[in-house]
Amino acid sequence: MPQTYTATAKFLHWLIAVFVFAQISLGLWMIGIPKAPPGIRVYWFNVHKSIGITLGLFILVRVVWRLTHRAPPLPATVPAWQRVAAKTSHVLLYVCMIVMPLSGYLGSSFTKYPIVYWGVRLPHWGWEAPALKELCSQVHLVTVTLFITLIAVHITAALKHLLVNRDGVFQRMWRRNLPAPGPTNS
């Protein structure tokens, strides 16, 4: 089994990471846009929806890839509790990556507003249901909050493996198969 992720897994990881960063940044920014004039707010919400749907498609590809390609093993030096923490956090990251775009899409489906995907109006299969829209919005908000927390933990753990442990874990997802630096002599 390779000691690094496949080129496809690395590409999907970093592509989705960039999209997620942009999407979360846009989402946090756009909630502060005044409701009047409505055209500006509608424009940015449609951009957010378009990025979300695109991201959802990339995530679907990533999930299928991950289910059909095993992750490389962690080094033997990684303690058992960290293995459990890594597996749990990865599962939760995937859950957030699925629930977040799905809850956003469903929430948009239960409003009177159309879903516009990069300028193309998608069929409106839902109906105006404020209670369902609010439920989906709350799920979306809770999920994004959990997702931001998990991303912070993920980045912190990756940097710990790169800068403190120096055990090659970070290099498994880097763009090239760099040799793992040896332990520090401190």
Positions of PLM-derived features:
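Membrane-embedded alpha-helical bundles that constitute the cytochrome b-like, heme-associated redox core
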Residues: 1-186
